[in-house]
A protein has these predicted regions:
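Acidic/histidine-rich, metal-coordinating catalytic segments
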Residues: 170-187, 205, 209, 259-264
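Basic, flexible linker segments flanking DNA-binding modules
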Residues: 3-104, 208, 264-273
Length: 293
């Protein structure tokens, strides 16, 4: 190989590397418009699924490109509690603590979180609206949601009815609805909708957030990833942002708990789903089941 050919090869390699790097940056920014807080690993998995070998980038190189261009995410956490379990309404036992779902529409989980809305007239400069989410425990698909100005049970009921509309026609299998013991979920109206649709209520038995960890986790994903860095000045803005976020989450975001499928894909499956993280809870449930035989 001549010196000229050698340098030409290096120039071509460098040009190609820079071109792919810019391609990755544009891709990451495009996805982040829909999911502002999505992490590097999930971004890389979406990238790998969408593009051919010609644009292939390894995970470590992908992370390095994000880092070099200031596209890493700084995490924000923590929301105040929206649960008031100090009431005299009937509550129900935890029916899911020893169950690993093996099909869609076996267990639904629900929780409520808050989202800030800027308000110059408010004492603190902002007010809150509230988001109810109902998610399938097997597929991780968000089936129902509602953005509301208050914590009244009527708003959570609308999220529940949205989820119920997704059930297949003639559905008759056992379905459990699991939540905390908040007044919304314990209200007579909410329980009646469950009963009218042959859905069995299940509730946490203590104030331990781990008892409803799955629902609290999806709320964190919506707030700290899908809506990351966004500010809102109206309830309508929050509604539109959540609507787009839920659509992206269900149809495009791969999930480590469902073998890197999207929730929409997993909702069409059955059988035990491979996790890409270790679940001590599931280990304990399986061990208990074996000892009972």
């Amino acid at each position: 190989m001549t010196r000229q050919a050698f340098y030409k090869r290096d120039e071509d390699f460098l040009f190609r590397r820079l071109a792919i790097e810019q391609f990755v940056v544009q891709f990451a920014r495009g996805v982040r418009e829909q999911d502002p807080g999505i992490g590097a690993d999930n971004l890389w998995r979406i990238y790998r699924e969408r593009f051919s070998e010609e644009y292939r980038v390894g995970r470590d190189a992908f992370r390095d490109i994000l880092h070099e261009h200031g596209l890493n995410i700084r995490r924000r956490f923590r929301a105040p509690r929206t649960t008031d379990s100090r009431h005299s309404l009937p509550t129900y036992p935890n029916l899911v603590k020893n169950v690993i779902p093996t099909r869609p529409n076996q267990i639904w989980v629900s929780d409520i979180t808050y989202i800030a809305i800027e308000d110059s007239e408010a004492r603190l400069g902002y007010t809150f609206c509230f988001l109810t989410i109902i998610m399938d425990a097997y597929s991780k698909k968000i089936l129902g949601w509602r953005v509301a100005p208050t914590l009244e049970a009527a708003h959570s009921i609308k999220a529940l009815k949205m989820a119920i509309k997704t059930l297949p026609e003639g559905f008759s299998e056992t379905l459990i609805h699991h939540s905390d013991r908040g007044t919304q979920y314990a209200s007579a109206d909410y329980i009646k909708v469950l009963a009218d649709n042959n859905i069995t209520p299940s509730m946490t038995e203590s104030g331990n957030p781990k008892d409803n960890a799955m629902a609290e986790r999806i709320n964190s994903t919506v707030k700290n990833e899908l809506l990351y860095g966004k500010t809102f000045s109206s309830l309508r803005q929050v509604f539109e942002a959540v609507r787009k976020a839920v659509g992206f989450y269900n149809s495009e975001r791969p999930h480590s708990s469902i073998d890197w499928h999207t929730p929409d894909e997993a909702h069409q499956m059955q059988g035990e789903m491979k996790r890409h993280w270790h679940s001590w809870r599931e280990d304990a449930i399986k061990k208990q089941a074996m000892e009972a035989v």
